[in-house]
């Protein structure tokens, strides 16, 4: 029913922790059975969005094979671990509105890459496991 779907979308949008995401998925499974990949994708996007905001990412944009993450807080010092894990794929730009970008490789999921990068930033680990 439409009211149930709207409520589910509201619950997904309110996700703030991994535990919240698990609770929402469990509830959806109890009510409707195994959720389609699109619903799992919404849960994943919601969790990554919240985690990114907590570590100082103000906006995320995908342009072609580039993920662009805007932040006034995250700089080269905080990107060390990201640059080690993804060598030759990270570019930092401090001119104008500061951002860093990552190249998405052929066949790679932009969402998985984004999740992996965001969880490497300082503060992400303590925030997502609650």
Regions found by a protein language model. Give the residues of each.
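Accessory helical-bundle/CTD segments and flexible terminal tails appended to RecA-like ATPase motors
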Residues: 1-130
């Amino acid at each position: 029913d439409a009211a149930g779907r709207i409520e589910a979308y509201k619950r997904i949008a309110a996700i703030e922790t991994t535990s919240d995401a698990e609770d929402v998925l469990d509830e959806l499974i109890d009510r409707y059975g195994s959720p389609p990949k699109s619903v799992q994708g919404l849960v994943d996007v919601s969790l990554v969005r919240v985690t990114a905001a907590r570590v100082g990412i103000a906006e995320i944009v995908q342009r072609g094979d580039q993920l662009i993450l805007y932040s006034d807080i995250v700089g080269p010092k905080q990107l060390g671990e990201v640059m080690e894990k993804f060598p030759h794929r990270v570019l930092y730009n401090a001119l104008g509105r500061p951002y860093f970008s990552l190249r998405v490789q052929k066949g790679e999921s932009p969402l998985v890459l984004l999740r992996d990068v965001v969880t490497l930033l300082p503060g992400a680990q303590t925030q997502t496991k609650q």
